[in-house]
UniProtKB/Swiss-Prot annotation:
Keywords, comma-separated and alphabetical: Amino-acid biosynthesis, Cytoplasm, Diaminopimelate biosynthesis, Lyase, Lysine biosynthesis, Schiff base
This protein's pathway: Amino-acid biosynthesis; L-lysine biosynthesis via DAP pathway; (S)-tetrahydrodipicolinate from L-aspartate: step 3/4
Transmembrane intervals: none
InterPro entries, alphabetized: Aldolase_TIM, DapA, DapA-like, Schiff_base-form_aldolases_AS
Gene (name only): dapA
Site (Part of a proton relay during catalysis): T45, Y109
GO MF annotation list: 4-hydroxy-tetrahydrodipicolinate synthase activity
Catalytic activity: L-aspartate 4-semialdehyde + pyruvate = (2S,4S)-4-hydroxy-2,3,4,5-tetrahydrodipicolinate + H2O + H(+)
Description of how the protein assembles with itself and partners: Homotetramer; dimer of dimers.
Biological processes, Gene Ontology terms: diaminopimelate biosynthetic process; lysine biosynthetic process via diaminopimelate
Family: Belongs to the DapA family.
Species of the source: Koribacter versatilis (strain Ellin345)
Protein name: 4-hydroxy-tetrahydrodipicolinate synthase
Predominant cellular place of this UniProt entry's protein: cytoplasm
Entry-linked PROSITE patterns: DHDPS_2
Length: 300
């Protein structure tokens, strides 16, 4: 399996009473696929997975698979900072027919050494027969997967890719220059996608594609086809929105815009909260200028 193109790190819609809005989630998945997205990533950070119960986590993944019906690859999130638990979660996801790969992040909070991270990911890989996509996001985990460690992990047959959100272009360039041919680098940062694609990345796991799946899929596709003029035009047009999605902690802003678009209700689970009014107003202005609010619909 080789992931390529733009994949959406899906939000998880909630109702006002705090329950998962499965009807809105179903509609979002269908809209994403109809818009030309290349793959889908349910239950990552953007999906507020830490606030989902175990049962809800599995149900969100299962419904994504059901709605997808084999049309695009599904890369389901399964992460824990307890290796034994991470292994069990990966096994559960691997057992869901229609899940194509598993996204798993570095152990967070307990700050393992590089050897600890290597053995953690190795244990997960050896426990399942599904491809693994590693998620390097040290800004959240406090545990960077260094290049030497990642290159060791890339030798494990079913570790096929990394979602790179370290924010360090020098590190990402080193990985791209030294990685095996069959190991894939995916951008985990919307705003850095074009530089990452230019040095050897082949895709993006996106937050902003929740809002603009068609446009970001076209941007990545254009870059991969060496149509850099089109890719730059789309990047420059949506760069302000990409950055505004992080005016506050993700997924606050992306869910706010989706609510403005009429695609979900704007509800969160603590500790996530609605945006401050001044930031929400700034975000709405940027979203309107980017043109994403012009076709707002009625929320499902």
């Amino acid at each position: 399996m080789k992931l390529r193109g733009c994949g959406t790190a899906l939000v998880t819609p909630f109702k006002q009473d705090g329950s998962v809005d499965f009807a809105a989630q179903r509609a979002l998945v269908e809209w994403q696929i109809e818009s030309g997205i290349d793959f889908l990533v349910p239950c990552g950070t953007t999906g507020e997975t830490p606030t989902l119960s175990h049962d809800e986590w599995l149900k969100v993944i299962a419904q994504t698979v059901e709605v997808n019906h084999g049309r695009v690859p599904i890369v389901a999130g399964a992460t824990s900072n307890n290796t034994a638990e991470a292994v069990e979660k990966a096994k559960e996801v691997a057992a869901i027919k229609g899940v194509d790969a598993i996204l798993t992040a570095s152990p967070y909070y307990n700050k393992p050494t590089q050897e600890g991270q290597y053995l953690h990911f190795k244990a997960i890989a050896e426990a399942v027969d599904k491809p693994l996509v590693l998620y390097n996001v040290p800004g959240r985990t406090a545990a960077n997967i260094e290049t030497a460690t990642l290159l060791r992990l890339a030798k494990i047959p079913n570790i096929i890719a990394v979602k790179e959100a370290s924010g360090s272009l020098p590190q990402i360039m080193d990985v791209c220059a030294q990685k095996p041919e069959d190991f894939t680098v995916l951008s985990g940062d919307d705003a850095l996608t074009l530089p990452i694609l230019a040095v050897g990345g082949v895709g993006l796991v996106s937050v902003a594609s929740n809002q603009i799946p068609k446009e970001l899929s076209e941007m990545v596709r254009a870059a991969l086809n060496n149509d850099w003029a089109t890719a730059r035009k789309l990047h420059n047009h949506f760069l302000a929105l990409m950055n505004a999605n992080f005016l506050e902690s993700n997924p606050g802003p992306v869910k706010a815009v989706l609510a403005m678009m009429g695609r979900i209700e704007e509800n969160y689970r603590l500790p996530m909260v609605p945006m401050r009014p001044e930031n929400r107003a700034k975000l709405e202005k940027i979203a309107a200028e980017a043109g994403v609010l012009k076709n707002a619909t009625v929320a499902q």
